[in-house]
Amino acid sequence: MHTVESLVMRKKNNILCIAMLVGLLCGCGKKYQYIPKDIETVEVEIVRFDSAQLAVRIDSVKQDIEKLYADYEEFMPMYVEGILRIPTEDTAYLCEMYAQFLTDTVMGFAQTNALAKEKFANVDSLQEALNTGFSRLHYLFPDWEIPAKVYLFVSGFNSSVMYYENVVGVGVDMYLGSDYPYYNQAAAN
């Protein structure tokens, strides 16, 4: 059962994807758009929700999840309902699934979580790329509201990017390389 918020988030994701596709198709006829080097710099904040997620301990899952709700009150409900597709009020099920998510080696979640933690330990280059990208986006579309924050999260192979109101989330486990072996296994299931 999906909530109104999750359906709205899906609709906004679909609209964003369509807008990006239209932009790509319309831009294909032009050679390129000149963007000056001295454009206004837009800085977005990267929020390391992924680090907090992976710091959850098996022996204190319930308390750690409650702490995630307290520390990330804006993002945690969107993550639980929109990415994990678990109703926020079903804490017992969330705790059970989260413990499995942290320890599962059959589907590769434990291995994937460890690799994501290692690969995204330093996000300085990602920060620079996001600032450059959003600066260019702001130059081309000055009326579009640039997200204030970009949350990094681990999705359990559920989502690579999410957009909701003024928040963007990036599933770091979906960016471990095209040859990452657990992608094929997840796709088969």
Give names to the regions the model predicted.
Residues 4-16:
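Bacterial N-terminal signal peptides that target proteins for export
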Residues 15-23:
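Sec-dependent N-terminal signal peptides
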Residues 25-27:
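C-terminal motif of bacterial Sec signal peptides marking the signal peptidase cleavage site
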Residues 29-99:
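N-terminal mature-domain "stem" immediately C-terminal to a signal peptide or N-terminal signal-anchor/transmembrane
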Residues 98-189:
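Acidic/His-rich structured neighborhood in mature extracellular/periplasmic domains
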